[in-house]
Amino acid sequence: MTTIKWQTAGADPEGWLSRVEKVIHLNPDGRAPSLAAPPEGNLRVGVDLGTAYTVLVVLDEAGNPLAGEYQFAQVVRDGLVVDFFGAVNLLKTLKDKAERRIGRPLTRAASGYPPGVPRAEVRATTHVVEAAGMVCERLVAEPEAANQVLGIHNGVVVDVGGGTTGIAVLENGKVVYTADEATGGTHFSLVIAGATGLSFDQAEVLKKTTSEQAGLFPLVRPVMEKVGTIIMRHLRGSAPESITLVGGTALFPGMAEVVQQVTGIPTRVPAHPMFITPLGIALSDNDT
């Protein structure tokens, strides 16, 4: 058994996540950074097949971030793989890019799934990973994976992705309840498209344009409020210390504030929320 990095990450997640940006985000010249030499030891690979983005991250044996690749693609809808061959080809592309950067082949990976997804669909995720050339030996519920990074003891982790909102309630460091509902960033785009007359693809671009987000906030606020309502419904009377929002949708300004207003529970968004879950998926693969 090797050292599990998330124990350190959970104690100081912001410090650990500050290093993630260096290996996942592109350099100003548009080229992703490569390693000076191939890493030694086993690698931990996490694959997150999202409704909006597919993300692949690579960690070393101790859990240090080495490389990450991501791309927008609608190969999954509400947690279900709807374009198998598209998902496989996309993952192969991300895998090839990561392999070139680290100088080693990726032969195995862990992947995640939204809570409540039918078992057959969970297996479909495994099939995508293996068709892309990696053995998939571990699957983990996405909000549980996120807490591998966050290390929350008593609270709620909410993974607001493109199509679904996944919830994990933690007590004494253990997940005691999980749930998933079909609300996420895609619904932001649908609302924006309906209000502006834009196509869905145009609304997606507008949603992610920083200079436009303040003006779009009144349109998407009801969706944010729905996320808060979903959380309250699944808490079922429990009183967690905090709510932590992860997933790409959590990047939209005002998300944490609206959820806190609806729930009355302190709510935060950590650094790089889109990468929390795939990093946790990789960290979950601790049988290297």
What do the PLM-derived regions correspond to, one by one?
Residues 166-168:
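A structural feature that tracks compact, well-ordered secondary-structure segments
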Residues 163:
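Short glycine-rich anion-binding loops that position phosphate/pyrophosphate groups of nucleotides
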Residues 1-51, 55-160, 174-288:
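Nucleotide/phosphate-binding catalytic cleft detector across ATP-hydrolyzing
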Residues 171:
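A cytosolic small-molecule/anion-sensing beta-strand core signal
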